[in-house]
């Protein structure tokens, strides 16, 4: 049986940490930021851990 391919879209969006958690970027921080409050853009900064419900699905896309 051939090797399973990693989902290329998922590999660009998700990353595995050293401890095995899966992290993602937060949405709504790409463009049209002029009218959004600074507090909101700061809150959307950085990465966050993927919800426990979604981890199984994301892991299968990443071949893990």
Curated annotation (Swiss-Prot):
Transmembrane segments: none annotated. It comes from the Bacteria. PROSITE patterns: RIBOSOMAL_L35. One of its GO terms (biological process) is translation. InterPro entries: Ribosomal_bL35, Ribosomal_bL35-like, Ribosomal_bL35_CS, Ribosomal_bL35_sf. GO terms for molecular function: structural constituent of ribosome. Residues 1-22 are annotated as: Disordered. Keywords: Ribonucleoprotein, Ribosomal protein. GO terms for cellular component: cytosolic large ribosomal subunit. It holds the Pfam family Ribosomal_L35p. PANTHER family: 54S RIBOSOMAL PROTEIN BL35M, LARGE RIBOSOMAL SUBUNIT PROTEIN BL35M. HAMAP family: Ribosomal_bL35. Belongs to the bacterial ribosomal protein bL35 family. This is Large ribosomal subunit protein bL35.
């Amino acid at each position: 049986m051939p090797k399973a391919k990693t989902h290329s879209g998922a590999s660009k969006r998700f990353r595995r940490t050293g401890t095995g958690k899966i992290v993602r970027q937060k949405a709504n921080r790409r463009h049209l930021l002029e009218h959004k409050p600074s507090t909101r853009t700061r809150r959307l900064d950085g990465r966050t851990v993927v919800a426990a419900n979604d981890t199984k699905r994301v892991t299968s896309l990443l071949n893990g």
